[in-house]
């Protein structure tokens, strides 16, 4: 497997307690990075740290849909280190069903996590990347955001918004050494 050199780099991986997010975190650790995994589920976070057993893996319980929570955790990290890499992986699919029957509170929750969570993390972390003239951001989306999935309008809409946010942010940062 190809290895990368991320020594002296710090990554934040949202939704990093399990699945794809944890796999990404492990890969960064193998490449020498310091990694902070964020998730809403402390039990899963502790389990991930116990499984990985790497002194460069740290965790925080973070609700990415809450900007103040994100901002506080970013400040905690940046008081000791730069944040060089952001992997916005956290997301939820929610229940399926036709739009006209969809629970409004659930719709808002899905969009709040899948779109606003991505915005909140970028909004809080990008200034640190600009200050340090370096950053890499990956916003995990879905083909559902491009094509739309029947009976998954909230998920499709949130991911479509995340795709648009990614394109816009990439253009805003095009003149800096920050790739989105």
For each predicted feature, which ranges?
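Residue(s) in the substrate-gating loop at a strand-loop-helix junction
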Residues: 142
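Active-site loop immediately N-terminal to the catalytic Tyr-X3-Lys motif
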Residues: 100, 147-153, 175-176
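Alpha-helical segment proximal to the catalytic Tyr-Lys
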Residues: 127, 171-175
């Amino acid at each position: 497997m190809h290895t990368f050199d991320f020594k002296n780099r710090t990554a934040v991986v949202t939704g990093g307690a399990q699945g794809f997010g944890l796999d990404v975190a492990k890969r960064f650790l193998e490449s020498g990075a310091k990694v902070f995994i964020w998730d809403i589920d402390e039990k899963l976070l502790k389990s991930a740290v116990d499984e990985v057993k790497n002194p460069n893996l740290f965790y925080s319980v973070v609700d990415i849909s809450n900007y103040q929570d994100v901002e506080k955790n970013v400040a905690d990290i940046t008081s000791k280190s730069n944040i060089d890499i952001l992997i916005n992986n956290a997301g939820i699919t929610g229940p399926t069903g036709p739009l006209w029957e969809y629970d409004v509170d659930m719709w808002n929750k899905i969009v709040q996590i899948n779109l606003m969570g991505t915005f909140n993390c970028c909004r809080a972390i990008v200034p640190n990347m600009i200050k340090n003239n370096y950053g890499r951001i990956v916003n995990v989306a879905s083909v559902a955001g491009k094509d739309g999935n029947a009976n998954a309008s909230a998920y499709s809409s949130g991911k479509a918004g995340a795709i648009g946010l990614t394109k816009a942010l990439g253009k805003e940062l095009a003149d800096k050494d920050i790739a989105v």
